[in-house]
Amino acid sequence: MDDTIDDEVISAGSTITVEFSGGAETLFGGVREHVVPLDGSKIVLLEEMLRWLRDNLLTGDAGLFMQENTVRPGILVMINDTDWDLMGEIDYILQPGDHILFISTLHGG
């Protein structure tokens, strides 16, 4: 995925929804929900989307969201309301219409 949004791709419905909750949204400019285009000409893994999010939407410290090529411990990831552990984690192949939810379970005190 690159950082350009192709109007043809969006009009064809080849997008996913990415949502941040539990404080994770503060790392993305306070925006809770983003519609992200998919490249319909190739298979896109969740791992690739994580890098795209880091490189294109992340406004906070990358270390608070990612650790190496995955999300850091303390961030729950749900794919269409199912724990990503059951879906293959970073090897999950994104599908048009997917809803990916990141929930931070780490709170300062």
From Swiss-Prot:
In its record, the post-translational modification comment is: C-terminal thiocarboxylation occurs in 2 steps, it is first acyl-adenylated (-COAMP) via the hesA/moeB/thiF part of the MOCS3 homolog, then thiocarboxylated (-COSH) via the rhodanese domain of the MOCS3 homolog.
For this record, the Gene Ontology CC terms, alphabetical, are: cytosol
Sequence position, cross-link Glycyl lysine isopeptide (Gly-Lys) (interchain with K-? in acceptor proteins): G109
Single GO biological process annotation from the record: tRNA wobble uridine modification
Question: Which CDD domains does the entry mention?
Answer: Ubl_Urm1 (cd01764)
Give start-end of the signal peptide. none
| A Pfam family reported for this protein in Swiss-Prot or TrEMBL | Urm1
Q: Where in the cell is it found?
A: Cytoplasm
**Presence of keyword Acetylation:** no
Q: Which Gene3D superfamilies match?
A: 3.10.20.30
Keyword terms, alphabetized = Cytoplasm, Isopeptide bond, tRNA processing, Ubl conjugation pathway
Q: Which residues carry this modification: 1-thioglycine?
A: G109
Which pathway, per its entry? tRNA modification; 5-methoxycarbonylmethyl-2-thiouridine-tRNA biosynthesis
Q: Which family does it belong to?
A: Belongs to the URM1 family.
State its role.
Acts as a sulfur carrier required for 2-thiolation of mcm(5)S(2)U at tRNA wobble positions of cytosolic tRNA(Lys), tRNA(Glu) and tRNA(Gln). Serves as sulfur donor in tRNA 2-thiolation reaction by being thiocarboxylated (-COSH) at its C-terminus by MOCS3. The sulfur is then transferred to tRNA to form 2-thiolation of mcm(5)S(2)U. Also acts as a ubiquitin-like protein (UBL) that is covalently conjugated via an isopeptide bond to lysine residues of target proteins.
> What protein name applies here?
Ubiquitin-related modifier 1 homolog
Name its species: Culex quinquefasciatus
Q: What is the phylogenetic placement of the source species in the record?
A: Eukaryota, Metazoa, Ecdysozoa, Arthropoda, Hexapoda
